[in-house]
Swiss-Prot record:
Family of the protein in this entry: Belongs to the UPF0677 family.
Residues that hold S-adenosyl-L-methionine according to the record: D129, D158, L159
Protein's UniProt keywords contain Metal-binding: no
One Pfam family, short name: LCM
Protein name: Putative S-adenosyl-L-methionine-dependent methyltransferase MAP_4197c
Length: 303
């Protein structure tokens, strides 16, 4: 797959297919021996998308051609998505516990937090994503008879367009503190769009707002294109027949911690390995997982 500046997608193509992949990993992570997340909507959503490989994956029908490496790669990807999901789950529940009642999930994909987290009374959750993605998930959740646990407001727009105006038009209150998530998103944006995303978040945020994201510091000399190919190769060994390479935008990026700090955010950052330790999952130490310690989970507070 090759990206363009104005490309769009549904949940069976391009970047949208990775949202389905992540949902499939959440479904598997929710059914392990000692799950650290619980997403009962992940598997039904994956089945509804209809991509054959991911449907078979959540139904236990995938047999990797190389069982040893394929199963290992699948476990690594599943555990990695599990700790990432738990990090963002804890971020939102912590912000709500501390009194924040307005939340925005950017590039929401098949995220079901508005339905599955324990939101307090008065909580409003905004989900922002491509129109086809929003329409599909809204219709599918209705067909599943799922009810949001917070007041859910969907915003159908590409994040490369004027999404702040669309957010305000849907009732977003710039005077209230907000909890923001940009999960699994930054590598799918051109470098300048990443900066613009954080500028827009900052402009929309009242003091006390919080932000959670993750990024890949360029500390290993590995380009985004190389990381995308490694990502694709791991899934290919599992048996995935969908080309997931070519989806990341290359180019020199701002250091997320430095960029946010320079705009008034108090930032903390932790490597992915620490999250494995926090949530009691074993982290595999070898050359094939070299990029994972370089993934950094970021949380920040404004003002």
């Amino acid at each position: 797959m090759t990206r363009t500046d104005q490309d769009s997608w549904d949940l069976a193509s391009s970047v949208g297919a990775t949202a389905t992949m992540v949902a499939a990993a959440r479904a598997l992570a929710s059914t392990g021996e000692r799950p650290i997340i619980n997403d009962p909507f992940a598997a039904p959503l994956v089945r509804a998308v209809g991509l054959d490989f991911f449907r078979r994956l959540v139904d236990g029908e995938v047999a990797p051609a190389d069982p040893q490496r394929g199963e290992r790669d699948l476990q690594l990807e599943t555990d990695s998505i599990a700790v990432r999901t738990r990090f963002f789950d804890d971020f939102f529940t912590g912000a709500a516990r501390d009194g924040i009642r307005q939340s925005v999930i950017l590039a929401a994909g098949l995220d079901a937090r508005a339905y599955r987290l324990d939101w307090p009374a008065g909580a409003v959750v905004y989900e922002v994503d491509q129109p086809k993605v929003v329409e599909f998930k809204t219709n599918t959740m209705a067909a599943l008879d799922a009810r949001p646990a917070a007041q859910l407001r969907t915003v159908s727009i590409d994040l490369r367009e004027d999404w702040p105006e669309a957010l305000r038009a849907n009732g977003f209150d710039v005077t209230q503190p907000t909890s923001w998530s940009a999960e699994g998103l930054l590598m799918y944006l051109p470098p300048e769009a990443q900066d613009r995303l954080f500028d827009n978040i900052t402009a929309l945020s009242a003091p006390g707002s919080r932000l959670a994201t993750e990024y890949h510091p360029d500390a290993t000399g590995t380009t985004m294109a190389q990381r995308a190919q490694e990502f694709n190769d791991r899934w290919a060994r599992v048996g995935c027949d969908i080309d997931l390479s070519g989806l990341f935008f290359d180019g020199e990026r701002s250091n997320v911690v430095e960029y946010l700090t320079g705009r008034g955010w108090r930032v903390s950052a932790r490597p992915r390995r620490d999250l494995f330790d926090d949530y009691g999952l074993a982290y595999p130490e070898d050359d094939e997982t070299a990029q994972f310690p370089n993934i950094v989970a970021v949380s920040a507070e404004l003002g």
